[in-house]
């Protein structure tokens, strides 16, 4: 997986060097990115971070659009300095002129939400399900008490969990 992506990063740098007739310092490439972001360019560290899950699910578009998008940030920073806007005209120039791609700010990849476990707590009131997060459930196990707002009785773990 990283070989194709690293190769694409190198190709993007070679394109920029041909276009601008100068060399650029190569970045470190990391696959330590999770969540909704497909990629992040850390300008001062000369580091590119990519989301391996989104890459796996959208490899073709990722290589075509996301990699040049992030490389363009580093190229723009090396050419124009740190006072430019992240998706400003300098970055757009690189996207259009060097990579011949639309300067899209955001990806449209489907991002799966992480499933979350809820711990069901109850009190004597009818229909009294209280779904607790893992953090709140942990607090109860450490001795914290939560009371029902209606009956003022302590909420007790039912032994049930629910995945959302």
UniProtKB/Swiss-Prot annotation:
The active site is at 70. PROSITE patterns: ZINC_PROTEASE. InterPro entries: SprT-like_domain, Uncharacterised_SprT. Its main location: cytoplasm. It comes from the Bacteria. Binds 1 zinc ion. Zn(2+) binds at residues 69, 73. Residues 14-156 form the SprT-like domain. GO terms for molecular function: zinc ion binding. It is found in: Cytoplasm. Its cofactor is Zn(2+). GO terms for biological process: response to stress. GO terms for cellular component: cytoplasm. Keywords: Cytoplasm, Metal-binding, Zinc. Belongs to the SprT family. PANTHER family: PROTEIN SPRT (PTHR38773:SF1). This is Protein SprT.
